[in-house]
């Protein structure tokens, strides 16, 4: 048999447990106004009601006072608001940052691709390096760049594939608006010796 449970409008506990909420006075007023029959059942209408009332009032006074209770509620709201603001700032930081994919020539026809700027998005760089190594069948490692930030270095000319994978990875995390910048840095050829040209 299903039974309907009534919850207090002040403390959100069932009325039988209102005494543990620290808001007993207000809970009793709410209960007497909204559910008089339940109030009579719990707190009685006998002669000893006044005694029970006196004891419960003492208990209510000894628990947290109303002013202090309101202060605690305000502090809780402030903390929640700070948390929301922090989350918004982090999201804005993620959206304003950019991922840089840079291709550099090593020797002759050998290239490396360096990906930086992913640490902002809480992506595990070592896992990503392992994924790239198995996906492209190349050597891949995580190293620190000149700015002391982690970057993934992939051996081989796989810039286009990496770019599409990074786009799909960011979309998966719900960050479609993040800029992915590609830089193609080729080594400058050394000029021939002037004496040999003449």
UniProtKB/Swiss-Prot annotation:
Question: What would be one Gene Ontology cellular-component term for the protein?
Answer: cytoplasm
Cite the CDD domains for this sequence.
DENR_C (cd11607)
Output this protein's name.
Translation machinery-associated protein 22
- Domain SUI1 spans what residues? 99-170
**Other remarks in the entry:** Present with 21600 molecules/cell in log phase SD medium.
**Subunit description:** Interacts with the 40S ribosomal subunit.
What taxonomic classification does the UniProt entry list for its organism?
Answer: Eukaryota, Fungi, Dikarya, Ascomycota, Saccharomycotina
Q: What positions belong to coiled-coil segments?
A: none
Domain comment in the entry: The SUI1 domain may be involved in RNA binding.
Q: Which Pfam families match?
A: DENR_N, SUI1
UniProt GO molecular function? RNA binding; translation initiation factor activity
Annotated compartments = Cytoplasm
Keywords, A to Z, come to: Cytoplasm, Ribonucleoprotein, Ribosomal protein
Q: Disulphide bridges in this chain?
A: none
Q: Family per UniProt?
A: Belongs to the DENR family.
Name the predominant localization.
cytoplasm
Query: Which domain of life, per UniProt?
Result: Eukaryota
Gene Ontology biological process terms from the UniProt entry:
formation of translation preinitiation complex; nuclear-transcribed mRNA catabolic process, nonsense-mediated decay; ribosome disassembly; translation reinitiation
């Amino acid at each position: 048999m299903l039974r309907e449970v009534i919850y207090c409008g002040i403390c959100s506990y069932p009325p039988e447990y209102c005494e543990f909420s620290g808001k007993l006075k207000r809970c009793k007023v709410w209960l007497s106004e909204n559910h008089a029959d339940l109030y009579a059942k719990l707190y009685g209408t006998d002669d000893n009601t006044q005694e029970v009332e006196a004891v419960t009032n003492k208990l209510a006074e000894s628990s947290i006072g109303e002013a202090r209770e309101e202060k605690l509620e305000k502090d809780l709201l402030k903390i929640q608001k700070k948390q929301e603001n922090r989350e918004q700032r982090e999201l804005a930081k993620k959206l304003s940052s950019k991922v840089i994919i840079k291709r550099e020539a090593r020797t002759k026809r050998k290239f490396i691709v360096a990906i930086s700027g992913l640490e902002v998005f809480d992506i595990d760089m070592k896992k990503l390096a392992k994924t790239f190594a198995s996906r492209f069948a190349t050597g891949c490692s995580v190293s620190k760049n000149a700015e002391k930030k982690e970057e993934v270095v992939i051996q081989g000319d796989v810039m286009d594939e990496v770019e599409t994978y990074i786009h799909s990875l960011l979309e998966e995390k719900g960050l479609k608006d993040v800029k992915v910048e590609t830089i193609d840095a080729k080594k400058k050829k050394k000029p021939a010796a002037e004496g040999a040209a003449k």
